[in-house]
A protein has these predicted regions:
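A short beta-strand-loop-beta hairpin characteristic of the jelly-roll/cupin
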Residues: 57, 66-93, 103
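Short glycine/proline-enriched turns and hinge-like loops at secondary-structure junctions
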Residues: 44-45, 63, 91, 110-112
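Short, solvent-exposed loop/turn segments that connect beta-strands within catalytic domains
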Residues: 40-42, 84-86, 112-115
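Residue-level recognition of conserved beta-strand positions in structured domain cores
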Residues: 49, 62, 81-83, 109, ...
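Ligand-binding loop in jelly-roll beta-barrel domains
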Residues: 92-93, 101-128
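A short, N-terminal "cap"/entry segment at the start of jelly-roll beta-barrel domains
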Residues: 1-44, 59, 131-145
Length: 145
């Protein structure tokens, strides 16, 4: 252990009504940066909010080498993945989800009347790779309303 002084980073607060749009976006999954390189001195972490409107379903995408942890803050959602996005996980308020690196997926809101809000964290950053011309299966979704 050394007694050499080290430069400490500053603590900071990002106000909810001042959050910037995150650099990586996907249609119908609007990301806002909370703790990020755009708003703080953080290195190797992105933490923000993701909004999906009533009945909306995102385009297919993945997050490169980033590991993603999500928390359903408000509403009910689903994530589709796997071959032709035929596998589905359902989530409700208070649930956590892990999305491994490079896994293509689609996020959706299970309600046609309420907004879905996720709290999402990624390491090392908010990497978003949108996937075009994907073969997406037509499956039944268990909407809540």
């Amino acid at each position: 252990m050394t007694d050499a002084p080290q430069e400490l980073k500053k603590l900071s607060v990002q106000r909810k009504d001042e959050l910037p749009m995150a650099p990586g976006q996907t249609a119908k999954a609007r990301r806002y940066s909370g703790v990020s390189v755009e708003t703080t001195e953080v290195e190797g972490l992105w933490f923000g909010k993701v909004y999906t409107g009533p009945g909306e379903v995102s385009d297919p995408h993945h997050h490169g080498e980033a590991e993603t942890g999500g928390y359903v803050f408000k509403g009910n959602g689903f994530i589709r993945f796997g071959e032709r996005y035929e596998d589905i996980l359902y989530m409700s308020e208070g649930d956590f989800v892990y999305v491994p690196p490079f896994v293509p997926h689609i996020e959706g809101n299970l309600s046609h009347t309420e907004e879905l809000v996720w709290m999402t964290t990624r390491t090392p950053d908010n990497i978003v790779v949108n996937l075009h011309d994907q073969d997406v299966a037509d499956i039944d979704i268990a909407y809540v309303d």
